Amino acid sequence: MKTTVAIVGLGSRGRVTYAPIAKQYPDLMEITALADINPACVEEAAKEYNVPKERCFTSAEELLAQPKLADAIFICTQDQDHVREALVALEKGYHILMEKPISPSAEDCNKLLEASRKYDRKIVVCHVLRYTPFFSKIKEIISEGIIGDVVTIQAIENVGYWHQAHSFVRGNWRNSNTTSPMCLQKTCHDFDLYLWLADKTPKRVSSMGDTYFFKEACAPEGAALRCMDGCKAKENCPFDAEKIYITNKRTGIAQGNTEWPVDVLAIHPTEESIYEAIKTGPYGRCVFHCDNNVVDHQITNIENTDGSNISFSMSGFTSDGASRYCKIMGTKGDITADMTKNIIEIGLFVQPREVIDVTKLATDFSGHGGGDVRMVLEFLEMITTGKEPQGITSLEQSINSHLVAFAAEESRLNHGAPVEIG
């Protein structure tokens, strides 16, 4: 059975990640309405998915002012807009797939939870890592009791030097005053993931972090305000916009990459359009002369209600961008997992180590390790059947990770003082 979908916010998530699923699975999903503040993005998506002009809008508010246009709505706008838009969508009768975070406000999170119960609509938050073959396998191992009761988790998120510069120094999520703190916008993914994997409830949180490097005081001698404006430090600067968006082997347009991150700078990325973007737009600014205030490194410790704990570290100073490592220690053994290599090792106390190659368990590892598509398909199935899949990130479950993030930011701003949850 096909589900009709409206998408608000046609950036790298709404337009590039979720919309193409309608073409991959045309029997399951059809896009029937679109909205974005950038008319060019709306026009492009409308052509791609045959959405009539009368169902295309220049804001989420304009779309939501219409009679109900679809079974479900994908909310892929900025962090501080999510709840306002979702509340109206619930009143209209939409089921909701919402980009994380829910909101930078705990009050708004609870307001949305109450509204979802009132209107009896499904809300799923996009904690996509739950849906990857990699973390699904780890969940299976823990649930089967193979390593016993989980006592300690040590986890690292390597954001990557260029990803940090792109998204959290130059990009949309650089300033917590207009979006969210880093521990909410980026690492609520991880808080949700590890609480879910170990089936734990958080009790107390402490956290430390700061903007260590991406600030004016760290600018090298001769640094210009923009990378293309005769910067004397350009040659040896790894954060140089021309390197990241033009010449870098992984991320640069000249190396054949026309997807993320260059597709954030131009709808149809070419060398010419990307050069124009870094000469005139926000992604060409010097990383030491931006208006960013989110942390570039942070450590968060979580004590759970059963006495177990989670130690989590996030860093923007790594060469291997967007990678995660974890060691999960239980009463019978441990799990060591490297998402970059898709390798999981199980070490029981009295047996040889077992190595699991996750690439042999699935074929699609695109989009957050295969999590993006799988999450959307489970959401569509839930709407069609009315049955909630076991791993689905419902609003109720997602709020736990947000409570940890709110506590972590409060602790960080108070020099690491512990903050109670609940």
Mark where each language-model region is.
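Short, Asp-centered acidic motifs that coordinate Mg2+ and/or phosphate
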Residues: A33, A72, T152
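Predominantly a Rossmann-like dinucleotide-binding segment in NAD(P)-dependent oxidoreductases
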Residues: G11, L129-G284, H415
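Beta-loop-alpha module in the N-terminal Rossmann-like domain of NAD(P)-dependent dehydrogenases
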Residues: V51-A115
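Rossmann-fold dehydrogenase core element
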Residues: K111-V128, G148-A155
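N-terminal Rossmann-like dinucleotide-binding module
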Residues: M1-V51
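Glycine-centered short loops/turns at secondary-structure junctions
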Residues: G93, D120, G145, G307, ...
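Aromatic/hydrophobic pocket-lining residues that form π-stacking "cages" and hydrophobic walls in ligand
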Residues: V42, E85, L112, I138, ...
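C-terminal helical cap and adjacent loop that interface with cofactors, partners, or active-site loops
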Residues: Y49, N293-G422
